[in-house]
C-alpha cells in the first residue's frame, strides 16, 4: 500500500473506529460483516483454516493448502517460503526431526509424509504423497461406497467424511512430537470447528459441474475436447465425466467418485525414487491397501501440478501422456478400458483442452472475487484485500497456464491488463470500484477469446 493511501486510512478512520469499538463486544467479526448464518459459518471456517494451530507445532490447515497457490503446495512455491515457515517444522524442531517429514523430498518434489496405515513402526510404515488441492469438493466427494477424501479416498478417519478429515489431519501433521498424544501434542477440533471447517472447504471453487462440450474457439483445444469425449479414442470422459471427478452415467465400473488402480505406482524412474531416499510402495485405499487411488477433477488440474498421488509427473502434457504408457495400459484400469493409444499431437490437444478449461475456471473465480469486493466500506477493507490478492494469484495462474501451452495470446494480453487493474484496486481505497469494474471487463474480454459469448 502506498504511503498516501496509508495516510488516508488513518485520516478517515477516527469516527468509524469509535463506533466500531462500541459495538464490537457484542458482535463477532463474522456476525458483523456476514449477517447470513451460512456465510458467517464459512467465514469462521476460513479463519480457523488459516489461523488455528490446535495447540500443535505451529502448523495450520493453510500451511499446506495455500490460498495463494491453488490450495496446495509445489516445489516452486515451497522455494519462496522462509526457512522458519511452519511447513519446515521438521527442520528446526528437534522433536520432529525423525519420522515426521523428509525435508529433502518436501523441498525438491513437494512431498509430505503420511502414515495412512497407522502410527505403528513410524520408520517404515509411511508413504510420501503430494498435497491435493481442496477445490470443488461438492462435486467430487460422494460415491456409492461413501465419501471419498484424499488421494486414495480414505483420507478421513471415523465416518470417512469431509467433516472428519480435519481430525486425521491434526493428528498427522500438527503434532508436537511423534507420540501424538491428545492434550500434550495437540487438541482435536471441536464439533463447532469441524462444522465451520467443512462449510469453508465446501465453499471453495466450483459448486457445479461443467456441461461438455463447450463452444470453444481454439483449434487445438477444440480438437482436444473431441478426443476427450470420444469413448473410443481418448476415453477420458468415462471416468472424468464433464472433466470432473465422477464416472459417466452407465460406466461399467460404477457411479460417482471412484477408485482405480491405474498403475502410477509402476512407473519407472519416479523422480523421488531417483534420490535414494526411502520410498515405501504406496498401496492406496484401505489398510492393507488394495492398490487403488481416487479419481481427481480435471478442471482444476492444469495449475495444480505436479500430478498423481506421488507427484511423479511435472506437466499436464506428461500427465496425459501417462495414459499411453505401459504402466497404465497394463494396469487393472487400463486393461478394463482396453488401453489408450494417442499420438503426440493428440496428447498435446487433450492437454490444451485441459489448459483452456482451467483458465476459464480461473476467470470465473476472478469475476466472482472481484464482484464481491469493494462493497464493505472501511471495515471490510482487509477482507477486500484478501479477495483481491486471491484474484491476482488466479489471474497469474490463468496467464501462465495458457502461455505454457502457447494458447490464446490475445486472452493472455487481456489477463495481463486485468492483473494490473486488480493490483491498482488493491492499492486504492476510495476509487477501487473503478479499477475492479475495468478488471472484470478485461476478464470477460479474455473469456470471449476462448469461448463463444453465449456460454
Label each PLM-derived region with a short phrase.
Residues 1-9:
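N-terminal secretory signal peptides that target proteins for export/translocation
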Residues 11-20:
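Sec-dependent N-terminal signal peptides
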Residues 23-25:
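N-terminal signal peptide c-region/cleavage motif recognized by signal peptidases
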Residues 29-455:
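Periplasmic c-type cytochrome electron-transfer domains
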